[in-house]
A protein has these predicted regions:
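C-terminal alpha-helical cap of glycosyltransferases
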Residues: 169-192
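Catalytic binding pocket for nucleotide-activated donors in carbohydrate/polymer assembly enzymes
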Residues: 72-164
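A structural signal for well-ordered alpha-helical segments within the folded catalytic domains
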Residues: 57, 64, 135-140, 170-174
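Acidic donor-binding loop of glycosyltransferase active sites
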Residues: 60-77
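Nucleotide-activated donor-binding/catalytic signature segment of Leloir-type glycosyltransferases, i.e.
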Residues: 1-61, 123
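Conserved, well-structured beta-alpha core segment at the onset of a catalytic domain
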Residues: 55, 65, 69, 156-157, ...
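Residue-level marker of positions within ordered structural domains that often coincide
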Residues: 46, 165, 181
Length: 192
């Protein structure tokens, strides 16, 4: 094919393309996948279930092909995607607006480990008002990760996997059982 697509970074037409925030931002930043561009964007706005028409590979198989995952969440009560990444030994960047990011910060602080991709996860502070700082911090983290040696990357991947093991359900269930017990006791007190 020698005729470029109208939107060369987009794999699927969107219902309201002119109102899509991600596509609008890509266009405003002139990410159009020119030959000379060092960064190429593949925007796949669909559920990766193995029948998306582009990859045709289930999400969990596709994630294994990543060197690094970036999930700059604005809000997620827990945020499974960063946890899924580290469970597959893929270091990731997330934010402190995702429950996983908050939890990972606490784990890193408890272990007196630096908040960096070399430790498997980088948690970026995000608010309503620091968009550019978040973008800069993510850019710097990705650039620094690209400079790591193969040995350092292997260690980061191992640390990512080890972090995920601390988030196994068998480790968290006790907290849910305690909360459930507390709720039952309080409900019982109210009915007396």
């Amino acid at each position: 094919f020698d005729t470029p697509l109208q939107w060369p970074m987009l794999t699927h037409w969107l219902h309201n393309m002119d109102q899509d925030n991600a596509l609008s931002m890509l266009c405003s930043l002139d990410f159009v996948n020119n030959k000379q561009d060092k960064v190429k964007i593949i925007f796949v706005p669909c559920y990766l279930n193995g029948n998306d028409g582009i990859f045709n590979i289930p999400y969990y198989d596709l994630i294994l092909g990543n060197d690094l995952c970036v999930y700059p969440s604005y809000y997620e009560p827990w945020g499974y995607t960063p946890l899924e990444a580290v469970a597959f030994s893929i270091p990731c960047i997330t934010t402190d607006l995702a429950g996983f990011g908050i939890w990972a910060q606490h784990v890193l602080a408890y272990e007196k480990a630096e908040n960096s991709l070399e430790n498997g996860v980088k948690v970026v502070h995000r608010t309503d008002y620091n968009y550019h700082e978040v973008a800069d911090e993510i850019r710097d983290a990705v650039a620094n990760y690209a400079l790591l040696t193969k040995t350092q990357v292997a260690k980061a991947r191992e640390k990512a996997r080890n972090l995920s093991k601390k988030a196994l359900w068998k480790k968290f269930i006790a907290y849910y059982e305690d909360a459930y017990d507390m709720a039952l006791r309080k409900a019982e007190e109210r009915t007396k």
